[in-house]
Amino acid sequence: MTVPQMIYLLSDATGETAEKIVNAVLTQFRDKPVRLRRISNVRNRPAALEGLQEAIKNQGMVVYTVVNRELAQYIKDECEVRGLMAFDLVTPLLSQFSQFFGRTPGQTPGLLHDMDEEYFRRIEAVEFTVKHDDGQEVSHLRHADIVLVGVSRTSKTPLSTYLAHHGWKVANVPLVLGIDPPKELFQIDPKRVVGLYIDSQRLVELRVARLKHLGQDPRAAYADIEEIEEELRYAKLLFRKQRWVSVNVSGKALEETANEVLVKLNLK
């Protein structure tokens, strides 16, 4: 059995960024068995030396992401003295940026990790929102940051998607006249629920356009003004009864509606 070659990732934060970059490069060497060993929070010489000694023991390569120039230089010097192959992922780029911006860089460790955390938080929010669109998986409503409720064509899905891309886990539940909403909707904190409504005439226009797009008769009950007004009365009554905050989406851009939702839920 072939023994995998070791690559040590020394980082002043978690090492996630270095690991992603190294793994991307390793896709070009799929025939080589490799093992990555992350050594996090390397912010002083003793911590760096401890990682290097392990690399020496296993004849590994060292890849490091350290923003402190003195510590990065120390790692470089020690690797040269000890015969370790090493690569600095950060210093060359910092130097180029310094020339480009005409100023010296800050040396705050962990900022790349903070960016990664924010990125993955948004990805997780989008994945959650897609799975909980249009009344899907209502058993998980309690895990949502925001639950949007409204009759058909009140911008529930696009608004959910917009909020998700800003890091909020959103579920949306349609209200249909004559059909009871899922019981799970009444079991969650009402302070996380927002009722969406729209002007009746505007809703007629949206539904007629939808029916035409689907090749269906635009005179169907779905787009009937009396039917729509009854649906909206039912929805608004439910909002008041459950003490859910409500937002009129008529004539508003998604950004404006999203901001209003966050303000009314005290999330902004």
Swiss-Prot record:
GO terms for molecular function: ADP binding; ATP binding; phosphotransferase activity, phosphate group as acceptor; protein serine/threonine kinase activity. It catalyses: N(tele)-phospho-L-histidyl/L-threonyl-[pyruvate, phosphate dikinase] + ADP = N(tele)-phospho-L-histidyl/O-phospho-L-threonyl-[pyruvate, phosphate dikinase] + AMP + H(+); N(tele)-phospho-L-histidyl/O-phospho-L-threonyl-[pyruvate, phosphate dikinase] + phosphate + H(+) = N(tele)-phospho-L-histidyl/L-threonyl-[pyruvate, phosphate dikinase] + diphosphate. ADP binds at G150, V151, S152, R153, T154, S155, K156, T157. Its EC number is 2.7.11.32, 2.7.4.27. InterPro entries: Kinase-pyrophosphorylase, PPDK_reg. It is an enzyme of class 2 (transferase). HAMAP family: PDRP. Bifunctional serine/threonine kinase and phosphorylase involved in the regulation of the pyruvate, phosphate dikinase (PPDK) by catalyzing its phosphorylation/dephosphorylation. This is Putative pyruvate, phosphate dikinase regulatory protein. It comes from Syntrophotalea carbinolica (strain DSM 2380 / NBRC 103641 / GraBd1) (Pelobacter carbinolicus).
